[in-house]
Curated annotation (Swiss-Prot):
InterPro entries: 4pyrrol_synth_GluAld_NH2Trfase, Aminotrans_3, Aminotrans_3_PPA_site, PyrdxlP-dep_Trfase, PyrdxlP-dep_Trfase_major, PyrdxlP-dep_Trfase_small. One of its GO terms (cellular component) is cytoplasm. Its main location: cytoplasm. This is Glutamate-1-semialdehyde 2,1-aminomutase. CDD domains: OAT_like. It comes from Methanothrix thermoacetophila (strain DSM 6194 / JCM 14653 / NBRC 101360 / PT) (Methanosaeta thermophila). One of its GO terms (biological process) is protoporphyrinogen IX biosynthetic process. Belongs to the class-III pyridoxal-phosphate-dependent aminotransferase family. HemL subfamily. GO terms for molecular function: glutamate-1-semialdehyde 2,1-aminomutase activity; pyridoxal phosphate binding; transaminase activity. It is found in: Cytoplasm. Keywords: Cytoplasm, Isomerase, Porphyrin biosynthesis, Pyridoxal phosphate. The modification N6-(pyridoxal phosphate)lysine is found at K272. The gene is hemL. Its EC number is 5.4.3.8. The lineage of its organism: Archaea, Methanobacteriati, Methanobacteriota, Stenosarchaea group, Methanomicrobia. Pfam families: Aminotran_3.
Length: 429
């Protein structure tokens, strides 16, 4: 049974509220990452198991946030835990190469034909930062084309927003980003081939960086032929195509969005799933490009925690499981949940829409968006009220209208049916 709801204040969140008050005095906004600053205050998780979270007040939740994507097997997967524990017994950081990073590199490359060489880093942000440096170093060009609303981490070249017009030179999206940096990033709308063509017309673009599926405003899916069109245009203008698959990698398919949509990138960034819930990122691509990365070439990239043995062990264990056909079952459950929500929205005659692919999903409080500007028209406050109703019912969705929800291997039909019961009850408003 789902829990009843009156308001956020009816939940016992006393410990979380107290922790948040302490945290606000110690950390900016009381959190270590802005997305965690749930209004009016976040709940503090104490432990997790399978598809469930338990907070400091003893409340339990079915988790569809899944740490914003990495926990595709659910929490505390026994096989992953065993491999991590075995590695910790041997030591957890050496500052030397290990067999594990060779094995994980081989495994990833076996699933991604577009990746011939790979560099492991510690985060998705580091991966995209390195990808842009590699693209600029390889092509000798400075300009980058970025999709409006696409998220690629928290470094200067991608913390850029559009000015006015369909194709615009970017302006800083954060204080502290130099205007001289932002001017080298050109913004174009997603799903707009003409805007992409115009952006590359000057032939001074090093690369287009994009999420094949926009994960931080939805998800918003590519229209038929869009990714193929971007691939064609970049080739015509000698620009590299970077697919940021930090979210979609090993989620849409074992070969990620490139396998699912049958479009290959020149450079690919990965993260989240390939670390099994531990810090990781990776950038890979064609051999002729990646051979330019130090120490083999002159494009510098380095990091103390690159190739962390614990992350490598967790990543290998995760891929071992996904390769057994588990990913197909996860994606089947994703289809089942999306259809269930769509049926509820239709039965209730709501002006909402359901988006998603594979194990990604979202309810938009408005029409189905095709790009960032359309996504912004959704009812954000209405979604926040819905979020709290669902949380009171024991279901943790991502707290923003513009964050993707996820399904894991731990979410079975019974759990999803309980979730649909809550959706039916609380989408009524």
């Amino acid at each position: 049974m789902i829990r009843s709801h009156v308001s956020a204040d009816t939940m016992n969140l006393n410990s979380s509220r107290s922790l948040y008050e302490r945290a606000k005095r110690l950390m900016p906004g009381g959190v270590s990452s802005p997305v965690r600053a749930i209004r009016p205050y976040p709940f503090y998780v104490k432990r997790a198991e399978g598809p469930y979270l338990w907070d400091e007040d003893g409340n339990s939740f079915i988790d569809y946030c899944l740490a914003y994507g990495p926990m595709i097997l659910g929490h505390r997967n026994p096989e992953v835990m065993r491999k991590v524990e075995e590695q910790i017994e041997r030591g957890w950081l050496y500052g030397t190469p290990t067999a594990l990073e060779v094995e994980l590199a081989e495994r990833i490359i076996s699933h991604y034909p577009s990746i011939e060489m790979i560099r492991f880093v510690s985060t998705g942000t580091e991966a995209t930062m390195a990808a842009l440096r590699i693209a600029r170093g390889f092509t000798g060009k400075d300009k980058i084309v970025k999709i409006e609303g696409g998220f690629h981490g928290a470094h200067d070249s991608v913390l850029v927003k559009a000015g006015s017009g369909a194709t615009t030179i970017g302006v800083p999206d954060s204080k502290g980003v130099p205007a001289d940096t932002a001017k080298n990033t050109v913004l174009v709308p997603y799903n707009d081939i003409q805007a992409m063509e115009a952006a590359l017309r000057e032939d001074d673009v090093a690369a287009v960086i994009m999420e094949p599926v926009l994960g931080n405003i939805g998800p918003v899916l590519p229209m038929d032929g869009y990714l193929e069109g971007v691939r064609r245009i970049t080739e015509e203008h000698d620009a590299l195509l970077i697919f940021d698959e930090v979210i979609t990698g090993f989620r849409l398919a074992l070969g990620g969005a490139q396998s699912y949509y049958r479009v290959r990138a020149d450079i690919t960034t990965l993260g989240k799933i390939i670390g099994g819930g531990f810090p990781i990122g990776a950038v890979g691509g064609r051999r002729e490009i990646m051979e330019n990365v130090a120490p083999q070439g002159g494009i510098y990239q380095a990091g103390t925690f690159n190739g962390s043995p614990v992350s490598m062990a967790a990543g290998l264990a995760t891929l071992d499981i996904l390769e057994r056909g588990v990913l197909d079952r996860i994606n089947e459950m994703g289809s089942y949940l999306r259809k269930g929500i769509s049926d509820i929205v239709e039965d209730l005659k709501l002006d909402y829409s359901v988006s998603g692919v594979a194990s990604m999903f979202k309810v938009f409080f408005g029409p189905l968006p095709r790009n960032y500007s359309e996504a912004l028209r959704c009812d954000k406050e209405g979604y926040l009220r819905f979020f709290w109703r669902m949380l009171e019912a024991g279901i943790f969705l991502t707290p923003s209208q513009y964050e993707t929800d996820f399904i894991s291997a731990s979410h079975d039909k019974e759990i999803i049916d309980k979730t649909l019961e809550a959706f039916k009850l609380f989408l009524k408003g």
